[in-house]
Structures are given as C-alpha cells and as structure tokens.
Amino acid sequence: EFAAYMGVDQEKGEPVLMDFTNRKLLEGYFKYVYEKIEKKDGVDFWWIDWQQGTNTAIPGLDPLWMLNHYHTMHSQKKDGKGLIFSRYAGPGSHRYPVGFSGDTVITWESLDFQPYFTATASNIGYGWWSHDIGGHMMGYKNDELALRWLQLGVFSPIMRLHSTCCEFNGKEPWRYRKEVELIMDKFLRLRHQMIPYLHTMNRRASEEGIPLIQPLYYQNPGKWDAFRMKNEYYFGSDILVNPITQPISTATRMGKVMALLPEGTWIDLFTGTVYNGDRKIELYRSLDSIPVLAKAGAIVTLDARTTGNAIDNPEILKVIVAAGADGSFRLDEEATDNVWCSTTFTYKWGDEAVLTITPEKTKKEGMPAERAYELVFTGTAQGMTAQKKKADGTYETLETSYDSDKQCTTVILPMQDIESEITVVTYNTALADNHQVERIFELLNRAEIEFSLKEKIYAIAQKKGSRNDAYLLDQLTLLNAPEDVFGAVKEILTALD
C-alpha cells in the first residue's frame, strides 16, 4: 500500500527513497507502515535505528533529526507524552529520544568508559541516556564483567539489557554461573523497587531541567578533583555512585574504585558503612555490591514489594533514611496521568531523632486508601527504639529490628490512612562505629592469601582502640601484604577519620 501510495512499482523491486522533507512520504510512512503495525500487533514504542540515510533535499538537514521529531509527534498523539528510542542526531537532539552510546564492544575497557559517557551526556542535555548493558558485540564472555555492567545499568537513567544477534551472547541472568545469576536477580529487582524514587527524579528533570545523573563537578564546581573523577556521579538529589569497572583482586576477591567524597558524612546504602567526607578514598567491594553512598540526612523511597512487575503506587513503601544530619525529601507519585500526589518526609537528627511524614490531604483516584511503611535508618548503632505519636498526643511503641551486618535499624509502621500525618521518634539514636575489627575479620576470612599473613594482620587490627590508626597502618605496611589487601584494610580502619 505504501509503495502504491508513493507511485513505486514494488514488483520491480523499486525502493521508496527516504526523504523526510517530502510531506507525502511522511504522511504515507506513518499511515501505511507504522499505524498498521501498531493496530495489528499492539506496538506502542519504537526503536528507530539505521534506516533514514544521510541526506535530505534540504542541504545541512540531518534526516535523523527529522525522523526523531516526527516519531515523537506521532507518539504524542497516542498518549500525550511521546517516547521513542533513537540514535544521537547532534546537539539539540536530546529533546526527542532516549539516547544510547552505540554498539559497545564487550570488554572491561569498554565498560570503564560507560559511566563517564553516561554522566557527561547530561552536559549536552541527554539526561535520558542508556548503554547496552553487558556490551553489544565482539569481545569475550566474562560473568564478572557482565555483572559489573548490570550494576552500572541499575544506577543509570535507563536500564536496558541488549546485544547483537549471537546465540552465545544472551543477557538473561540464568545464562551466568549461579552466584552471578542470584546477584543479577537482586539488582534487577532493586531497580524495579526504585520506581518511586526514579519517578520523582524524572519529574524534577522534566519540570526543572535537572538530570537524574550529574557529574561530580555539578555540585562541587570549586574542587578540581571533582573534574578528574570521571566515573563517579550523583544519582538523584543525594546519592553518589561509584561503579566498579575492573576485575576483582585475586587476593581480596573484591573490586576497587577511587572515590571522592564531598564534605559531610556519607553512608553506603548496601553495607551501612559510615564515611567522613572531604577526601579521596579507595573503596573495595565484593561481587554483590558497588559503592552507592547517601549523604547524611538523605531520604530514599522504594517500593517495598519484592516480586512482580507492578507499576501502581505501592501500598507499602520502604523509606531509607541516612543517619547523621537533618534532611528532607518530597516523593511525587502520579495518581493518574499528569495528576500528581506528593508526600514530604522531614528528618531531624539527634539522640531523639524525629521523622515526619506529611502526605497531601486530598485523596485521589489511583492512590491506595492506606499505606504501610518500612523505615530503614542506615548507618545507625544498635540500641535504637522507636515510637509513633498518636492523635491524642501520647506515643505507641513500634516494632524495631537491627541488622548488624548492614548497620541499619528497621522500624515497621502498619497500614494507616494514606492522608495521615505521621511522626516517628527514635531514641538512643547514634551513628554506627563500622564494627571495624569484625569487618576486617570478614575481609581476611574471604581473602586468598597465606594463613600466617591473615593472623598477623588480624592481630594488628585487634589493637584498634588502644592504638591510633597511623600506628596500625605503619605496622601493616611492615608486613608487605598485597597492595589490595592493605588497601581494603585501610578503608575499614580510616572510614571515619
């Protein structure tokens, strides 16, 4: 039909030449090709990739730019928003598609470039930038490489697993060894749980022009080191991400990355480790995590449900509060398309810390009638208790639990009216001390080094408290331990320096 509409003899194999300055071609292109496929097969999203040619009848006009423009308009007619996925078409093309970094080769060197490429895409307006998680083509099979790439992808604007057509190049988690499969599964579920946080940040990007991912120098323009840390970036308002882009050490079984921590206190969201900022520090992580640090006072909202693909507004929220400072966060949720509902979380730090949850007072269709909360105070010492302030001014004790490995206290708020303002007071609230000796033991227990060296390092670590860190580090240096073993122990000893 399209060929006949354009006056092309299809039986002779004549092509329809793409030129989007031709209005007749433009109209037929959508009417006879795209709209028919959409109606027949239920397609509602298009990836536009390599079909537009390089020239138009108007000198200097990039046909890809025109293609992206009209495809976005076509998408907007269906749902009022418009979303397409396409190639980069030069400066200014960010206004249309989700972009991507091209056909990446599957190597560690290629992975190491992706965080920098993704973060700096924000400099040209491409806040919605993506990469082929795990790499696209050529290269080699490496389970650890695939996992580290996926971990980066979870903390990217768009999470998208993709590869070239190769029967050996699958990205499904079950195509990797069991240890890696389980970690991939955990991270993929985490990405889905982050929808409340991501949707809030994407609204901020749409209305205020602030991208989800920002190079470190956006918030630290006066620090020259911020310009040198190419792979470190902000993920939303108060989270720092440092992807690991090199293989693990055979000695520590951990990967490492050099990070710059801005001023203040920072807490790792996976381990609960507390760090003092305003310095550079090497961070070491096993396969099951990467450094994701929240600034003290940061509040991160997650969907507390752990299974399924639901995208409705959850009846139970997991709210992570980074201990150590005051903070606030406004959660924005869409009740229905373009009808927003906001909830403000305010945290006052202290021995008796106070978290206040203030939802909008107008119930809206699409929001749950009731909501429960799982409050996770990360970076806290053991011994916290919690109470909720009741309407009559009295307090009721809440269920709490402590995870020593992750240094976090969890407080459970049962179901209550979605419009209820909630005040939670925690008592004996203090920052964790990082359980340094215990963590060094765990590190050494995992390390693949001589047993005698493990014993010597651990003996020095047990002097923590009676000797200062400088003395302990001097003693460790004399042992001539492998560089990564020394570095990992040093991170634990000096995190709070």
Where are these regions (language model features)?
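Residue-level detector of beta-strand structural context in well-folded domains
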Residues: 230-231, 257, 343-345, 398
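Solvent-exposed beta-strand/loop surfaces of large extracellular or lumenal domains
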Residues: 267-287, 385-413
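Generic beta-strand structural signal
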Residues: 234-235, 261, 349-350, 402-404
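Accessory, solvent-exposed terminal regions and/or long lumenal/extracellular loops of proteins
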Residues: 292-394, 405-497
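A generic structural signal for short, solvent-exposed coil/turn residues
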Residues: 76, 120, 208-210, 233, ...
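Catalytic-domain carbohydrate-binding cleft regions of carbohydrate-active enzymes
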Residues: 1-289, 481, 488-497
